[in-house]
Amino acid sequence: MTIVVGFEGSANKIGVGIIQDGKVLSNPRRTYITPPGQGFMPSDTARHHRSCILDVLQEALEESNIKPEDVDCVAYTKGPGMGAPLLSVAIVARTVAQLWKKPLLGVNHCIGHIEMGRLITGAENPTVLYVSGGNTQVIAYSERCYRIFGETIDIAVGNCLDRFARVLKISNDPSPGYNIEQMAKKGKKFVELPYTVKGMDVSFSGILSYIEDMSHKMLSSGECTPEDLCFSLQETLFSMLVEITERAMAHCGSQEVLIVGGVGCNVRLQEMMGVMCEERGAKIFATDERFCIDNGAMIAQAGWEMFRAGQVTNLQDSWITQRYRTDEVEVTWRD
């Protein structure tokens, strides 16, 4: 029996999760929410995390009925992410590991998403679409590495959605992406937007610039509604993602797709990916908001896999990094 506590705080979510041999014992989190039209600053986000991380840890321990002496390892997000929030959480994880006299493990944020998705859905060897506010990658496992076959060449798909939400002054509660999804369901007119796919890579900065420039004119003239723009943006972005995922599946000979990351909660994205998979005779796997959105349990699960494979992070090496690519990690726990 192996129990791992995981700390996640790479962006505006702070979470602590506890995993015991593939079972999620607890997974509380808090979200830093800013007013409509605003993003979240690293310093303010870090301040939020510092103010509530111990309460979240206490909640996780109480919910799981786990005591410090029961824990085998403490895992934390090493990166990628926002520097100040990452550092705040890493300091707490280091302190907890020393107080409890437990080994420490630095975990790649993306690997956490993948391993949590595999655990929850039962996907065996899928092509992974990782879509969030900071990342957009198409990934597949090969020779002890999660290899990136396609990715954004500029901004992430979630960042594109978030920044457009600011243009329309859409609420950030519970998240701008979720609120865009709800508005898109009411859209009736499709507005043609730039579509940029280069092989298995995508670009979202052009479509964002275009819709930012044109939205005021379109809305003021009555040419379309905010709901129409949300609908059009979603359809265009998600079509691009489905295209590069299918291309990666064909390249890898894969019959499974796993969608992870915060944008992976979007039901419309899952529907569009499902249509493609059905036409290919493939299976689609996705999780709900409990595990798609950043959470501590995913870091605990990746830490559990790493710890069982004999990995630990020395205290002097327990730094954080804002840039930490998925394919930099040697996946020692898979055949």
Curated annotation (Swiss-Prot):
What this protein catalyses is: L-threonylcarbamoyladenylate + adenosine(37) in tRNA = N(6)-L-threonylcarbamoyladenosine(37) in tRNA + AMP + H(+)
Biological process terms from the Gene Ontology for this record are:
tRNA threonylcarbamoyladenosine modification
Keyword Acyltransferase set for record: yes
Quote the cellular component terms of the Gene Ontology held in the record.
cytoplasm; EKC/KEOPS complex; nucleus
Source organism: Xenopus laevis (African clawed frog)
- In this chain, a divalent metal cation is annotated as bound at 109, 113, 130, 294
Keywords annotated in UniProt: Acyltransferase, Cytoplasm, Metal-binding, Nucleus, Transferase, tRNA processing
Q: Which residues form a coiled coil?
A: none
**Catalytic EC class:** transferase
Subunit comment: Component of the EKC/KEOPS complex composed of at least tp53rk, tprkb, osgep and lage3; the whole complex dimerizes.
| InterPro entries the record matches | ATPase_NBD, Gcp-like_dom, KAE1/TsaD, Kae1_archaea_euk, Peptidase_M22_CS
Q: Where does substrate bind?
A: 130-134, 162, 177, 181, 266
Q: Does the keyword Transferase apply?
A: yes
Q: What is its main location?
A: cytoplasm
Q: Can you tell me where the transmembrane regions are?
A: none
Q: What does this protein's UniProt record list under function?
A: Component of the EKC/KEOPS complex that is required for the formation of a threonylcarbamoyl group on adenosine at position 37 (t(6)A37) in tRNAs that read codons beginning with adenine. The complex is probably involved in the transfer of the threonylcarbamoyl moiety of threonylcarbamoyl-AMP (TC-AMP) to the N6 group of A37. Osgep likely plays a direct catalytic role in this reaction, but requires other protein(s) of the complex to fulfill this activity.
Q: Which HAMAP family match?
A: Kae1
Q: According to its UniProt record, which protein family does this protein belong to? A: Belongs to the KAE1 / TsaD family.
**Cofactor names:** a divalent metal cation
Q: Which GO terms describe its molecular function?
A: metal ion binding; N(6)-L-threonylcarbamoyladenine synthase activity
Q: What is the lineage of its organism?
A: Eukaryota, Metazoa, Chordata, Craniata, Vertebrata
Q: How is the cofactor bound?
A: Binds 1 divalent metal cation per subunit.
**Can you say what this protein is called?**
tRNA N6-adenosine threonylcarbamoyltransferase
EC numbers: 2.3.1.234
Kindly list the places in or outside the cell where this protein is found, as annotated in its UniProt entry: Cytoplasm; Nucleus
